[in-house]
C-alpha cells in the first residue's frame, strides 16, 4: 500500500534507524525544560511540553499511527469488487503532497526546500520504483491477510541487508543470519497455515480452488513487492546522499512525482465506467471509503512525525526495537478487525516472526556497538566489489 513511510521504517531498521534521511525531523526541535513559578497550576503549554518530551507518549503515538495505516489500507482494498488501486494510491499521494505544502505554509515544516526541476528529473527514477513498490504492496494486501502480509514483509529486510553487502560495503553477522532464518521459517509457517485454513474452510471443491488461486495471487504479488521494495529503498539510499535531501524533501518529491504516473496508469488500466465506480464505492460504505483514502494519505505524515519524535526523545536503538515489537500488534490487528483465520499455525507464524524481528533489532544494536568500538569485533566479511571500492577510495 502506500506504506511509503512503513517501507522507509523497514529501511531504517536495517540501517540502525534514521541513517539515510539526514535530519531526524525538520519541525521537531528539542524543547527546553518548561519552568513554572512555584505554587501555580500547570499551564497547557507546560503540559504539552512534558508530553512532547515523553518517551512513552512518542512510542504509543508511533505504534498507533503505524497500526492505523495498515488497518485503513486493508479496509479500503478489501471490498468485494475493488479494482482501483492506482486511483487509491494517487489520492494518497495527492493528500500527502497537499498536507506537506500546508505544513510548510503554516510553519510546521520549516526547512522544506523549494521545488527544483533538475532535482525532480534526477529523482524521477526513484519515484517510478516507488510506484512499483506501493502498487505491488496494495495488491498483496488485497489478497493476503494482514498477519501474513506483515510476516512476509520481513523478507524485505533480508534482501536489503544483502543489497547493502553488495553495494554499500555492509556486513551480515551470525546473529543476523539467525534472524533471517527465523524470518524465512515464519513465512513458510504462515503460508502453510493460510493454505490449510483455506482448505478447511471451504472443503475440497471449486471453492477450494478459488481460495487457493486467491492466495497464490497474493503470494506472487508479495514476492514482487519484496523485490520492488528492496530496489526502491536501496536506490533511494544511493540517490538521496548525492542530492542532500532532508526527510521531508524526499517525501515531497516522492509524492509529487508519483501523482502524474498514478493518474495516467489509472486512466489507462482501470475501468472508469459508472457501473464499475458503483461497485467500488457502494452507497452504504462510500463515505467511509473516502475518509479512509484521505486518512491514509495523512497517515504518512503522522508516521514520519511520530518516528522522528520517538527517535528524538528516546534513541535510535529504542526506535529500532519498537519497530520490531510493533510487528506483533499490527499482525494482531488483522486478526481482530478482518476475521483472519486464528489457528495454531497462524499464531506460531506470528510468534516466530515477532521473535525474528527482535533478534534482528538486537543484532543491529550489537553491530553498531562494534562499529563504535564498544564491543570486541572481528573484521566483517564483505563482497569483492565492496572491498575493491573501499580499496580504490583509500
From Swiss-Prot:
Residues 78-81, 146-150, 200-207, 271-288, 339-341 are lumenal. Residues 1-56, 103-122, 169-174, 229-249, 310-317, 363-394 are cytoplasmic. It is a multi-pass membrane protein. It comes from the Eukaryota. GO terms for cellular component: cytoplasmic vesicle membrane; endoplasmic reticulum membrane; Golgi membrane. Keywords: Cytoplasmic vesicle, Endoplasmic reticulum, Golgi apparatus, Membrane, Sugar transport, Transmembrane, Transmembrane helix, Transport. InterPro entries: TPT_transporter. The chain crosses the membrane at residues 57-77, 82-102, 123-145, 151-168, 175-199, 208-228, 250-270, 289-309, 318-338, 342-362. It is found in: Golgi apparatus membrane; Cytoplasmic vesicle membrane; Endoplasmic reticulum membrane. Belongs to the TPT transporter family. SLC35D subfamily. Involved in the import of GDP-mannose from the cytoplasm into the Golgi lumen. NCBIfam families: nst. Homooligomer. This is GDP-mannose transporter. The lineage of its organism: Eukaryota, Fungi, Dikarya, Ascomycota, Pezizomycotina.
Amino acid at each position: 500500500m502506500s506504506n511509503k513511510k512503513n517501507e522507509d521504517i523497514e529501511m531504517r531498521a536495517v540501517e540502525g534507524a534514521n541513517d539515510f534521511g539526514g535530519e531526524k525531523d525538520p519541525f521537531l526541535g528539542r524543547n527546553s525544560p518548561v519552568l513554572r513559578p512555584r505554587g501555580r497550576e500547570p499551564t497547557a503549554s507546560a503540559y504539552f511540553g512534558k508530553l512532547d518530551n515523553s518517551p512513552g507518549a512518542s512510542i504509543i503515538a508511533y505504534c498507533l499511527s503505524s497500526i492505523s495505516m495498515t488497518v485503513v489500507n486493508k479496509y479500503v482494498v478489501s471490498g468485494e469488487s475493488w479494482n482501483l488501486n492506482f486511483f487509491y494510491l494517487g489520492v494518497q499521494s495527492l493528500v500527502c503532497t497537499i498536507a506537506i505544502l500546508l505544513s510548510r505554509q503554516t510553519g510546521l515544516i520549516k526547512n522544506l526546500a523549494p521545488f527544483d526541476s533538475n532535482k525532480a528529473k534526477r529523482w524521477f527514477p526513484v519515484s517510478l520504483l516507488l510506484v512499483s513498490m506501493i502498487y505491488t504492496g496494495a495488491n498483496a494486501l488485497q489478497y493476503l491477510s494482514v498477519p501474513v502480509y506483515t510476516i512476509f514483509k520481513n523478507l524485505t529486510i533480508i534482501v536489503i541487508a544483502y543489497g547493502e553487502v553488495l553495494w554499500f560495503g555492509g556486513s551480515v553477522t551470525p546473529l543476523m543470519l539467525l534472524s533471517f532464518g527465523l524470518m524465512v521459517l515464519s513465512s513458510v509457517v504462515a503460508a502453510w497455515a493460510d493454505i490449510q485454513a483455506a482448505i478447511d474452510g471451504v472443503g475440497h471443491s471449486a471453492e477450494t480452488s478459488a481460495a487457493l488461486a486467491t492466495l497464490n495471487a497474493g503470494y506472487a504479488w508479495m514476492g514482487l513487492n519484496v523485490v520492488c521494495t528492496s530496489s526502491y529503498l536501496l536506490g533511494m539510499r544511493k540517490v538521496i546522499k548525492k542530492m542532500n535531501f532532508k526527510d521531508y524533501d524526499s517525501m515531497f518529491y516522492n509524492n509529487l512525482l508519483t501523482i502524474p504516473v498514478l493518474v495516467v496508469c489509472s486512466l489507462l488500466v482501470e475501468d472508469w465506467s459508472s457501473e464499475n465506480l458503483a461497485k467500488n464505492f457502494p452507497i452504504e460504505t462510500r463515505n467511509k471509503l473516502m475518509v479512509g483514502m484521505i486518512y491514509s494519505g495523512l497517515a504518512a505524515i503522522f508516521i514520519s512525525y511520530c518516528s522522528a519524535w520517538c527517535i528524538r526523545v528516546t534513541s535510535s536503538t529504542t526506535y529500532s526495537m519498537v519497530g520490531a515489537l510493533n510487528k506483533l500488534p499490527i499482525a494482531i490487528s488483522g486478526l481482530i478487525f478482518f476475521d483472519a483465520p486464528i489457528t495454531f499455525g497462524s499464531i506460531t507464524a506470528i510468534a516466530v516472526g515477532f521473535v525474528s524481528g527482535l533478534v534482528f533489532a538486537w543484532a543491529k544494536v550489537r553491530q553498531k556497538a562494534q562499529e563504535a568500538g564498544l564491543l570486541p569485533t572481528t573484521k566483517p566479511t564483505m563482497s569483492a566489489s565492496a572491498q575493491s571500492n573501499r580499496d580504490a577510495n583509500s
